Amino acid sequence: MTKIKLIALDMDGTACSFHQGIHEANIMPIIKAQEMGVRVIFATGRPVLTSLSEAIKVKMDYFHQYFIGFNGACIYDIKTHTIVHQQTLSTSQVNFLFQLAKKYHKKLWCYTDDLTKVIVNFNPVAENNPELAFFDGEFIQYDSALTIQNKSYKCIVMDVHENDDFIIAARGQNIEIAIDASGTAEINAPEISKLAGLKWISSQWNIALSEMMAIGDSMNDYWMIKNVGLGIAMENSQEQIKAIAKEVTTTVETGGVAKMIEKYILNNRK
């Protein structure tokens, strides 16, 4: 098997318990892999700034790793605290999505391109929306009488499915959409994905996709799991992910990530 030089980890449902921190079993294997010279990065749909504490917990700042946030729309240098690569939804696309959400009575949450603000068309605090776990910045309430001036790294729409009128209309706008098992859709700029983020990092660090291991559980992990050298699905993955993975590990709650790092990195090198 090709030597693994980089491990890309999804966060929620993979390295981290759902909407929580890194599972305890995964911490030391991630650190040890980096000590052996293997690059380890998070590739997540989460926003960047509120997720950095988890990266720092496993010394990704010390080992000067990158962080793929918003499904690949923003790549962040954890050590220097700078954005090194980005691609956003345009202001016209963001305005269109809010108009569409109003038409079809959908809740929409958009992360703006300054990393500290979100635009919403509902009250997430009053509704105790689960996305609050990832954001502690400023909320801007959508006003249909005004034109939104912000670009967006990622928009989230709740309670949808593949044949939803909102999704059908949105897919005609040259955007990327991934819908998870809970019916939440993540919307990004065209050709944005975790795989696209890994391809950019590949060009910067001279690490081929065939030399990467990627672990994930949801549809926004599909393309990176399918295209890297060793794509691994969690036992708690959606079935479409298990179908294209080269291996299925155990669940997030049983340290499935740790088991794969130990098998392919820690126990495979003398």
Model-inferred region functions:
Residues 2-6, 23, 185-270:
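Mg2+-dependent phosphoryl-transfer enzymes with acidic/Ser/Thr/Gly-rich catalytic loops
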Residues 3-19:
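Asp-based phosphoryl-transfer active-site loop
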Residues 37-41, 63-65, 153-155, 210-212, ...:
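Short active-site oxyanion
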Residues 39, 107, 176, 230-231, ...:
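Residue-level detector of anion-binding/catalytic polar loops
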